[in-house]
Design a protein with these regions (language model features):
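ACP-dependent fatty acid/polyketide chain-elongation machinery
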Residues: 1-60, 230-238, 325-341, 380, ...
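N-terminal amphipathic, basic-rich helices that act as targeting or association modules
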Residues: 1-4, 64-80, 84-90
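Conserved small-residue
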Residues: 6, 24, 96, 140, ...
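Short glycine/threonine-rich loop-to-helix capping motif typified by GTGT followed
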Residues: 249-255, 284-299, 317-322
Length: 388
């Protein structure tokens, strides 16, 4: 059995896991308007507006990015647990697997802005090492002087959860005894304008599963765990599953057959027929919500369900990790208040029925599933369970 530490979270809703969970339970939205990513457009984003930790003088220059600053915040939150694992197992037996889609792309965009404005490209301000997706995993390994397996997963919006799945496999295969895992992404010009070009960004707060939904709001953040073969908490990863639609690069298969297969596989591996709570991918796009409602209805029925993206934005490579962290925390508490599904209350009746959580709903969550669906038809599901 692979156990999970109490997770660390940073997002627009706060700088710790406890603050994030409390903020999400309030039902408030933590989105703000920003014009810093396009001179003519103002976007509604989930930006962390607090103070980020500073890098030490020993930190290599290509690690000094906003993405890694968000990650560092979560590292420091579970620092004691990480150091205990390193002391017990040794630096070669602790691995790092992280999901990301951005790495240091915004910092490397600065010289391009200069070129657009002046016609001069300052090569001294561009470092390809910032852009490498492995940058975030290398940062963690360098910070703790680890020599175990260290790599990144970048499968768009499933990156964060698939990093946790990979970490579990590393321990099961006996390549590691503990793994630091999760996901991190920061707001940046490239990603926001890329999504805008697909016409799926909403100028208003996201209304997932509403008949009035217009699209997503982008956010930033990080979710981090320590996974271990030791019983470091009362919650373990019960199972996971992933597959691919092989249908379309930016749209899901509306038959939902592969999403259904993914959910069913995760349930089968866990040896259960259902879960107490499911965290929905819930982007608020026409395509995702249509497919996801069908998949959830046909596999999980009236299970309590909600998405946190309308509150903190879609954090992309961090989303699956943050949402997995919330699921794990719910399992750790014997009398959980469930995260409410925040929207305008006008459910799209053309969708299959989903039991969206109302504010103040309490339930003893012993099992919780998190769902992630990505561009390229990539699907992932993970189940956490309370073991004592």
């Amino acid at each position: 059995m692979i156990y999970v530490s109490k997770p660390a979270i940073i997002s627009a809703a706060g700088s710790s896991s406890d603050e994030n969970l409390s903020s999400l339970l309030s039902g408030k939205r933590f989105l703000s308007k920003s014009s810093e990513f396009h001179p003519q457009n103002e976007f509604l984003v989930g930006k962390f507006n607090g103070v980020l930790p500073s890098f030490s003088n020993k930190t290599k220059e290509h690690f000094k990015t906003r993405t890694n600053a968000l990650l560092l915040s979560t590292m420091l939150e579970i620092d004691a647990e990480i150091k205990r694992a390193i002391k017990k197992y040794g630096k070669s037996r602790v691995g790092v697997v992280l999901g990301t889609t951005t790495s240091g792309v915004e910092e490397n965009f600065e010289p391009f802005k200069g070129y657009i404005a002046t016609g001069f490209f300052d090569k001294s301000r561009f470092d390809i090492n910032r852009n490498c997706l492995a940058n975030v995993a290398e940062f963690v390994s360098d910070f703790y002087e680890l020599s175990g397996p260290s790599y990144c997963v970048s499968t768009a919006c499933t990156s964060g959860v698939k990093a946790v799945i990979e970490a579990k496999r590393l321990i099961e295969s006996e390549l590691c005894d503990a793994v630091i895992c999760g996901g991190v992404d920061s707001l940046n010009t490239l990603t926001i304008n890329g999504f805008n070009s697909l016409s799926i960004l909403s100028s208003a707060p996201s209304q997932a599963f509403s008949k009035n939904r217009e699209g997503i709001n982008i956010g930033e953040g990080a979710g981090l765990f320590l996974l271990s073969r030791d019983e470091i908490s009362n919650v373990a990863v019960a199972s996971s599953a992933s597959n691919c639609d092989a249908f379309h690069m930016t749209q899901p298969d509306f038959s939902a057959k592969m999403a259904i297969s993914c959910i069913e596989e995760a349930l089968k591996k866990a040896g259960i027929d259902g879960v107490d709570y499911v965290n929905l991918h819930g982007t608020g796009t026409q395509a995702n919500d249509k497919m996801e409602a069908k998949a959830v209805n046909l596999t999980l029925g009236a299970t309590f369900a909600s998405t946190i993206k309308p509150q903190i934005g879609h954090t992309l490579g961090a989303a699956g990790a943050i949402e997995s962290a919330i699921c794990a925390m719910l399992c750790m508490d014997e009398n959980s208040t469930l995260p409410p599904h925040v929207y305008d209350g006008e459910y799209d009746e053309s969708l299959e029925a989903v039991n969206l959580v109302k504010s103040g709903t309490k339930f003893d969550v012993k099992t919780a599933m998190s769902l992630s669906f990505a561009f390229g038809g990539d699907n992932a599901a993970i189940i956490f369970k309370r073991v004592r």
